[in-house]
Amino acid sequence: MTDVTVERIDTLKTGDLHDLCDAADDAVKAGGGFGWVAPPAREIMERYWKGVLVVPERILFVGRLDGVIAGSAQLVKPARNNEAQAHAATLTTSFVAPWARCHGLARRLTVAVEEEARASGFRVLNLDVRETQRRQPSRCTRIWASAVGARIPSMRWWTAKGWPDISM
């Protein structure tokens, strides 16, 4: 039986940085680049993940498959001086490596971020999806609705180059 877990982490244990970079590298190559079109040099990716852990407005969640980091998601809180957006956080860098998909990690990561956002008092959780990920908006909506046990009563739609983008 496959062991699937999600946890909030504040430090990277031995091997975690390597696993996180490997999973992110695989996800970027598969088109889920959360800002990268091609994987950056390993040193850059390592610095990125180390940096995430020291930014107070970022909370990192990792998904593990049999103890190996296979995906992540972050809750990003607004800057303290952003009074107008103080009610809204962002779910970002959400990915699962291709080799770890279909085990429920995306759903569990989404639930963890959503629960943390709600516990922190946020009323809005934003999710941005890249235009090249045309199937992602409906997939993300299904994962979110499934994760929180909700039906989507209404959404705001914008058209960007001929396809719908969803803001929840």
From Swiss-Prot:
User: Is Transferase one of the keywords UniProt gives this record?
Assistant: yes
Q: Where is the N-acetyltransferase domain?
A: 7-168
Which CDD domains has this protein been placed in? NAT_SF
Entry EC number(s)? 2.3.1.-
- What GO terms are given for molecular function? acyltransferase activity, transferring groups other than amino-acyl groups
Specify one Pfam family: Acetyltransf_1
Query: Mind listing the UniProt keywords for this protein, alphabetically?
Result: Acyltransferase, Transferase
Q: Does the keyword Phosphoprotein apply?
A: no
Could you identify this protein by its name? Uncharacterized N-acetyltransferase in hisH-hisA intergenic region
Source organism (scientific name): Azospirillum brasilense
